[in-house]
Amino acid sequence: MGGISIWNLVIIVLLVVLLFGTKKLRGLGSDLGESIKGFKKAMNDDKAKDAEFEKVEQKTAESTEQKAKEKEQA
């Protein structure tokens, strides 16, 4: 009694379609999809940059250690 039944959801969906129309809803859906794709692409680009930064940081640390060892030997 206190919950939302399937018929209540059907009526709500029909009202939304009548108010906004299918063109606006279709446009809204495609805009939302493009936004999600852009967000995922940005996250993947960020991961690639982080991995590249870690490689550079590791090389720098190795060269610093190597220079320190050379100074100790000299």
Swiss-Prot record:
UniProt KW keywords: Cell inner membrane, Cell membrane, Membrane, Protein transport, Translocation, Transmembrane, Transmembrane helix, Transport
Subcellular location: Cell inner membrane
TM ranges: 1-21
Membrane topology of this protein: Single-pass membrane protein
InterPro entries for the chain: TatA/B/E, TatA/E
Tagged with keyword Glycoprotein: no
Coiled-coil ranges (or none): none
Location of region: Disordered: 51-74
GO molecular function: protein transmembrane transporter activity
UniProt entry tagged with the keyword NAD: no
Principal localisation: membrane
Gene Ontology biological process terms, A to Z: protein transport by the Tat complex
GO cellular component: TAT protein transport complex
Matching NCBIfam families: PRK01833.1, tatAE
Family assignment from sequence similarity: Belongs to the TatA/E family.
Known partners and oligomeric status: The Tat system comprises two distinct complexes: a TatABC complex, containing multiple copies of TatA, TatB and TatC subunits, and a separate TatA complex, containing only TatA subunits. Substrates initially bind to the TatABC complex, which probably triggers association of the separate TatA complex to form the active translocon.
Record's function text: Part of the twin-arginine translocation (Tat) system that transports large folded proteins containing a characteristic twin-arginine motif in their signal peptide across membranes. TatA could form the protein-conducting channel of the Tat system.
Protein name: Sec-independent protein translocase protein TatA
Annotated source species: Glaesserella parasuis serovar 5 (strain SH0165)
Native organism taxonomy: Bacteria, Pseudomonadati, Pseudomonadota, Gammaproteobacteria, Pasteurellales
Gene from which this protein is expressed: tatA
